């Protein structure tokens, strides 16, 4: 039995493998994608309990992806992951 369905969008997914394995061991089903377009496509196909979203990806940025995901699934919680400390990025993400 699954504890929940997670979507993780990050262009450096290979670096996150240990975290994904940890979540899977804890009973979560984790769908991984490497860009915003694929994340949006997955949100059209499935209902996720939580989305982990990198801010800096090729193609659509994390913020652009977040806006489209919130249009499709406004109640789904999204955690933005970024190395940036720029306040405007945080403000934009919170405002979405």
Regions found by a protein language model. Give the residues of each.
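Non-catalytic signal-transmission and effector/linker regions of two-component phosphorelay proteins
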Residues: 1-5
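Two-component/phosphorelay signaling modules centered on CheY-like receiver
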Residues: 13-31
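Acidic catalytic/metal-coordinating carboxylates
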Residues: 34-38, 61-64
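Short amphipathic alpha-helix used as the core "switch/output" element in two-component signaling
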Residues: 41, 63-74
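Active-site beta3 strand of CheY-like receiver
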Residues: 46-52
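Receiver (REC) domain active-site loop signature in two-component systems and cognate sites
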Residues: 57
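Alpha4 helix (beta4-alpha4-beta5 surface) of REC/receiver domains from two-component response regulators
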Residues: 64, 85-96
């Amino acid at each position: 039995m699954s504890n929940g369905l997670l979507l993780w969008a990050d262009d450096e997914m290979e670096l996150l493998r240990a975290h994904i394995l940890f979540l899977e061991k804890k009973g979560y089903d984790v769908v991984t994608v490497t860009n915003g377009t694929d994340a949006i496509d997955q949100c059209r196909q499935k209902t996720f309990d939580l989305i982990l979203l990198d801010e800096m990806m090729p193609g659509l940025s994390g913020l652009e992806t977040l806006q489209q995901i919130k249009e499709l699934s406004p109640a789904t919680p999204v955690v933005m992951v970024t190395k940036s400390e720029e306040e405007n990025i945080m403000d934009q993400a919170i405002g979405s």
